[in-house]
Amino acid sequence: MRAALAQANARRFAALGDPTRLQVFALISRAPLSVAEVAAQLPVSRPAVSQHLKVLADAGLVSLETAGTRNLYRPDTDAVASLRDFIDSLWDVGLARFKLQAEKVARERAATHRKEKR
């Protein structure tokens, strides 16, 4: 992973590390929402929601769109894809290691079974 991408993903994961911020992100992932709409669904004030959205935006996780007089927040699809690609790469490595270990155990069992038959 390139250093710049690693830094960007680290900022994104750090931004999502706050439980309230993670809830905010989950809400806007379902549908674009305004600050007031997010605040209505959480036990935090509008100014607090605004601050959480600012942190998410600074990390590149959300984008803002204007719909008439409303400002709506939504996840940035490129940023989410980058995080998913990173997690998928970890999963791929883990599966490959698991496969190697399973094959090793199968070979050892087969060898033990052959010895017992002699």
Predicted regions: what they are:
Residues 22-24:
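Pre-recognition alpha-helix immediately N-terminal to the DNA-recognition helix
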